[in-house]
Structures are given as structure tokens and as C-alpha cells.
Amino acid sequence: MAMTLEQTRQAIIDRMQSFTGIAQDRIQYPNAPGFTVPKEGLWCRLTIVRGPSFTSGVADKPCNRRTGNIMVQCFDRLHTGEKALTVLSDDLLAHFEHFSFEDLECLNGESIYAGKDADFIQYNVSIRYLVN
């Protein structure tokens, strides 16, 4: 039986919750109430972005594969350097790249400098995935 979108979402959240590279109370999860941005240090925001689907086979019945991106936005205060963000990005990539669970397959990822504003510098860690 094909993995549903909800099962995929939960598998990704479970994987993020097993990540030990940053305290869990510093990660903002989708639809989780009550997150407060820390006054100091690193913090992250997890977003699961679904992509297009495609038919990968039509044996007895069509097999549709779903695509998407696991996006982890990583933030640190300005003027604290970028080493901590770089190490966190490396750790997140190592944690997610080529991970699989049931019909979820995480592919390669990247860490991209996303800029800064008046308070934070931001890196985006993005890992592509396929389901089914």
C-alpha cells in the first residue's frame, strides 16, 4: 500500500525529532503552537514542501510517486560568526541525506546562504525526497 501524504509528513517530523545536533526546543515544527524564538543561539524552522507527482509504473495498477523538499531554515544572531550555522548545516545534511523509511526516500541536499535581516543570519538546508 502506498505511503500517504500524512504518513510522509509524520516520518519526516519523526526523523527531525531524532536529530541531536540542536536542542528540540529550538526547532519550530509545522503546526506546533507556542514556539518562542530564543534570545541567543541557533534555532531552526522545519517546513515540508510537497512537489509534483509522476507515474513511475503501470503494471497491475498505476504507481504514482510524490516528490518534495524537506526545508530546514537555520538562524543565528548577527555578528556571531557563521561556524555554528555551517556545522549545524553539515549535521542536518548527514542526518537526512539518503535516509529511508518505508516508502520515503531522502535524496541529496544542500545548504544555501539565504541572507540576513536586522536580527538574524539564515542558511536553508534543503533535502529532496521521493515517496512510493
Which residues fall in each region the model found?
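Short C-terminal domain-edge/linker segments immediately following a structured domain
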Residues: 75-82, 101-106
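Alpha-helical context
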Residues: 48-51, 61-68, 72, 103, ...
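Short, surface-exposed linear patches
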Residues: 50-53, 66-70, 92-97, 128-129
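Acidic-leaning, charged glycine-interspersed low-complexity segments
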Residues: 18, 90-132
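Oligomerization/assembly interface segments of phage tail-like spikes and tubes
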Residues: 62-78, 121-132
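Small/polar-rich, solvent-exposed N-terminal microdomains that initiate assembly or binding
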Residues: 1-60, 80-91, 99, 117
